[in-house]
Each structure stands twice: as structure tokens, then as C-alpha cells.
């Protein structure tokens, strides 16, 4: 890893008085996992990564190890952080985090690393002169967790109607803290409204290159839960947390843009400059779609 990048992260951690820095990754079940290093060992751990048993990528969402060849309790990879993804966590004072790649002991991206797979897909698109843009449209339930004779249950913070001002008012304190926490991590909430389900929230983050968009979705999920807990609440992004209410969507919007010399196929910059071209658009087509767009849709289907 670049020595200058490591030094920049160490300086950020020192300036913020950060005590623990989380090296995070996402497993095949969508669970955000990781390990943390202290500030005193941050420089060394960034260079070496942190060891992780290969079995973790065979765990299901209940931490039950599944029988997958090559993913047993013997063998490890390294959790290697991306220094460009460093953020201080406003909902966990004294902590910071970085998104990480899973690297094998030969220093190569591990085949079972989702983030490395996305990097590879973006590089393949870049070879065809394309930059992939993406954004998520996540929804989540904001609720109180109550314990009763039949076990824990989630009770929504409101029973308001979709888009109603009552919903805005009842979730106001949480919403403001969420927006500020997102901004503190270098992102911005573009739209917000109470959704169809009781207690259901929708806050949308601006699109960006695919890798950045995926990382932002992780920060979004972590922030929703972290801010909720500090309010004594529970934020659930599960597809159907309440059987009698609308489920939570997590729509992923994506498009392809022609790359220019100052585009950012590496994945961490702003959206394409105005002079780049939306490769999915064709003004002469009945539906405004280019041949590439039709082929892309066909590939997805």
C-alpha cells in the first residue's frame, strides 16, 4: 500500500483522536463484518492487513458455517483497507472505519471478495471505454424494540400515511441527526420522505461511480442503525421486518457513461463531467435508448 496514503489516514485518525479503526467488508449474505485495530497499530495494520479465516465467507446470516469447498476453518486471507474510504463515525465517537478488500496471502484479490469482483467488473467496463454509475434507493423501518411475553417485537415510531407531514414530524429528531451524520462522512442526502409502511423512512444519496456507490450504501446502512441506536430506536433494512406493513426496497439504479481522459473508472470520484455522454441514451430511438442500453437490459434479463 502507498506509504503516503497510510500516512494520510494515520494523520486523520490522530487529528480526530480516534481510538479504534474498523476494517469492514461485506459477506455474501449482505452482512457488514470486520475487525478493528487501535490507533497505535494502525500504520502497521494498514500495511499488513488483518487476518481473517476463509470460513467467514461461507457463513450464513445466522453464523452457521456452510459446506463450501475451500472455505473451511483452515486457511486465511487479509482484510486490507482502502485508505480513500476512511471516515470518522459520528454515531460512534472515537471510532472510524474503512471499506476493505479481501486479499490472499500472495497479495492478490481473493476470488470470494465481492468488492474485488466489482473492481474487476469496472476495469472490464473501462477497457470498453465505459464508466459505471450507480445509486441505491434504500428504505428502512424506524421502530422501538419492545420485549414482551412472546419475545422482542418492533413497534414503528409512527402510523402516519405515506408522505404525510405527521411522519416528518414524528421522525424529525432522528432525520436531522441522520442527515448531519451522513454529511460528516462526505455524503449528502438529496431527498427524504416518510414511506408507505408505518415508521418507514426513505433517504436517497447521490449517485457516483459504482464502487463509491456500493461503499456509500454500506455507510448508509451503518449510519441508519448507529443513529437510531443513539436515539433508543431500531433501524431495520430487512426486506420485510413487519408482516402487515410494506417491505423495504433497496433499488439499485445504474447506467453506463462513455469515459474521457478525466473520468474516474477507479471508482472514487464525482459523477462524470457534463461533457461525457450517457451511453444508454439515443435521441433518435422511440424510447430514447441506445443499442448498448438494449443489450445491457438483455444481459440483465
Spans of model-derived segments:
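Glycine-rich anion/phosphate-binding loop at the beta-strand->alpha-helix junction
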Residues: 212-301
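Active-site-proximal beta-alpha loop/turn segments in soluble metabolic enzymes
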Residues: 155-166, 198-213, 242-247, 278
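ATP/Mg2+-dependent ligation/transfer catalytic cores
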Residues: 1-191, 233
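A short mid-domain helix/strand-loop element embedded in enzyme catalytic domains
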Residues: 150, 189-204
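A glycine-rich phosphate-binding loop feature that marks nucleotide/adenosyl-phosphate handling sites
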Residues: 26, 138-143, 195-200, 240-249
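Metal-centered catalytic cores of metalloenzymes
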Residues: 3, 190-197, 210-213
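Short, hydrophobic beta-strand segments
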Residues: 98-104, 201-207, 254
Amino acid at each position: 500500500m502507498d506509504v503516503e496514503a497510510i500516512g494520510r489516514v494515520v494523520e486523520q485518525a490522530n487529528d480526530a483522536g480516534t481510538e479504534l479503526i474498523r476494517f469492514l467488508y461485506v459477506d455474501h449474505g449482505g452482512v457488514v463484518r470486520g475487525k478493528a485495530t487501535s490507533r497505535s497499530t494502525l500504520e502497521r495494520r494498514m500495511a499488513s492487513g488483518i487476518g481473517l479465516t476463509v470460513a467467514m465467507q461461507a457463513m450464513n446470516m445466522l453464523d452457521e458455517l456452510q459446506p463450501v469447498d475451500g472455505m473451511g476453518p483452515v486457511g486465511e486471507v487479509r482484510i486490507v483497507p482502502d485508505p480513500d474510504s476512511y471516515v470518522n463515525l459520528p454515531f460512534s465517537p472515537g471510532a472510524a472505519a474503512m471499506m476493505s478488500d479481501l486479499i490472499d496471502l500472495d497479495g492478490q484479490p481473493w476470488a470470494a471478495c465481492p468488492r474485488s469482483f466489482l473492481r474487476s467488473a469496472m476495469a472490464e467496463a473501462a477497457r470498453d471505454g465505459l464508466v459505471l454509475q450507480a445509486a441505491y434507493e434504500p428504505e428502512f423501518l424506524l421502530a422501538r424494540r419492545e420485549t414482551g411475553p412472546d419475545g422482542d417485537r418492533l413497534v414503528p415510531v409512527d402510523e402516519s400515511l405515506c408522505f404525510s407531514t405527521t411522519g416528518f414530524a414524528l421522525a424529525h429528531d432522528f432525520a436531522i441527526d441522520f442527515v448531519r451524520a451522513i454529511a460528516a462522512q462526505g455524503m449528502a442526502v438529496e431527498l427524504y420522505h416518510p414511506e408507505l409502511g408505518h415508521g418507514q423512512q426513505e433517504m436517497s444519496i447521490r449517485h457516483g461511480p459504482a464502487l463509491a456507490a456500493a461503499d456509500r450504501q454500506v455507510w448508509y446502512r451503518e449510519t441508519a442503525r448507529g443513529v437510531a441506536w443513539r436515539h433508543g430506536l431500531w433501524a431495520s433494512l430487512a426486506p420485510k421486518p413487519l408482516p402487515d406493513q410494506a417491505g423495504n426496497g433497496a433499488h439499485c439504479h445504474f447506467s453506463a457513461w462513455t469515459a474521457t481522459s478525466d473520468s474516474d473508472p477507479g471508482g472514487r470520484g464525482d459523477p462524470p463531467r457534463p461533457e461525457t455522454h450517457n451511453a444508454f441514451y439515443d435521441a433518435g430511438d422511440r424510447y430514447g435508448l441506445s443499442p448498448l442500453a438494449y443489450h445491457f437490459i438483455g444481459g440483465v434479463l
